[in-house]
Amino acid sequence: MSAVGNEPLARQALAFVLAGGRGSRLLELTDRRAKPAVYFGGKSRIIDFALSNAVNSGIRRIAVATQYKAHSLIRHLQMGWNFFRPERNESFDILPASQRVSENMWYVGTADAIYQNIDIIESHNARFIVVLAGDHIYKMDYEVMLRQHVDSGADVTVGCLEMPRAESSGFGIMHIDENGWIQEFLEKPADPPPMPGKPDVSLASMGIYVFDAKFLFDQLKRDAEDPSSNHDFGKDIIPYIVKNGRAIAHQFSTSCVRSGDDPRAYWRDVGTVDAYWAANIDLTDVVPELDLFDRAWPIWSYSEITPPAKFVHDEESRRGQAVSSLVSGGCIISGASLRRSLLFTGVRINSYANVENAVIMPYVNVGRGARLKNVVIDRGVEIPEGLVIGEDPELDAKRFRTTEQGISLITQPMIDRLNT
């Protein structure tokens, strides 16, 4: 089976993005927002990567299911993703949990999130449904995955990547035959099975699925009638198809969007504070694995109108400077030193402050003489003058949230408690 005429398969698809999760391992970073709404990379939110992949792949019909503390996410989507044109058969639907099936039921699983909106999805008359997780960082051409789905004749195509076994227990793990057909699918096993010939590696699901639309709707209706089901793709839908139908694996390495000749396939979960900090700080490398400067595959997002970043004062002990750092618009580095750090919009770092290995979210104000190292600072925090973080691990652990790798997470309530 081939595409209709020369029309890309992506133009016949609808992307359904699951964006309702909290991401509790991010601790206080998700106290006020869902994980897909967490800031990333200086200008974006995490969800922008899945959405940008869809748009860059040619998909022009998108639906986003939201649930946990969705206001920040919905506002971002309304401001940054409002460029779709219905007259061109484009659409962008935001679908908050709204008890559409029962007045006592919110979304109870990933599959249920689509089932509860099945009438809306069916109305778009898409040939394919591409199910996406809205909380991962990667660049991928979904057209390649759609092509494999059609050429193979599979009931479902599951995106997958090789992952160290030690890090795989939080993902669906699959075993495939020599042709890529999935023989077994285990959702989040405590002891992930290894790949044949690779004892330290498991084949993990990316939470990306391609279905023929009618087949998916039939599966969702069947699953909804099963009282023993969790109504979840990883726990129920995919294992059922593996057992009773045809499920094929799509290797991320074949559709990953790389920069130049870089052989690495970049994908990050950023599900913990340590992983989140590391993925952001990695962007300050001379040649980072994730290329945000790639004009051929841009990461679309809402961008505030701000003046350029400003660096002021040029005295020996009071010089506004930044080395190996990303500094967003509206920031002012006023006689302060910044090294290997990433600043989001509107951050101000005042005179004599020293900041190193820091991820600082929008509109943070760092007081004079502060010394900050190995930190993640939440939006809008006021850092007092002279505050020192990152030099005394025991003291940091008493005052802030510190991780196994020594990263301190700073929020305004933590700062407020310093004076009590």
Curated annotation (Swiss-Prot):
Ranges annotated as spanning the membrane: none
Entry EC no(s): 2.7.7.27
Assembly: Homotetramer.
Enzyme class: transferase
Binding site for alpha-D-glucose 1-phosphate: Y107, G172, E187, K188, S205
Protein name (database record): Glucose-1-phosphate adenylyltransferase
Family according to the record: Belongs to the bacterial/plant glucose-1-phosphate adenylyltransferase family.
Pathway: Glycan biosynthesis; glycogen biosynthesis
Disulfide-bonded cysteines: none
Gene3D superfamilies according to UniProt: Hexapeptide repeat proteins (2.160.10.10), Spore Coat Polysaccharide Biosynthesis Protein SpsA, Chain A (3.90.550.10)
Catalytic activity: alpha-D-glucose 1-phosphate + ATP + H(+) = ADP-alpha-D-glucose + diphosphate
Domain of life the protein comes from: Bacteria
Gene: glgC
Pfam family, any one: Hexapep_GlmU
InterPro entries according to UniProt: ADP-Glc_PPase (IPR011831), ADP_Glu_pyroP_CS (IPR005836), GlgC_bac (IPR023049), GlmU/GlgC-like_hexapep (IPR056818), NTP_transferase_dom (IPR005835), Nucleotide-diphossugar_trans (IPR029044), Trimer_LpxA-like_sf (IPR011004)
A single GO BP: glycogen biosynthetic process
Function: Involved in the biosynthesis of ADP-glucose, a building block required for the elongation reactions to produce glycogen. Catalyzes the reaction between ATP and alpha-D-glucose 1-phosphate (G1P) to produce pyrophosphate and ADP-Glc.
GO MF terms, alphabetically ordered: ATP binding; glucose-1-phosphate adenylyltransferase activity
Keyword entries, A-Z: ATP-binding, Carbohydrate metabolism, Glycogen biosynthesis, Glycogen metabolism, Nucleotide-binding, Nucleotidyltransferase, Transferase
Species this chain originates from: Bradyrhizobium diazoefficiens (strain JCM 10833 / BCRC 13528 / IAM 13628 / NBRC 14792 / USDA 110)
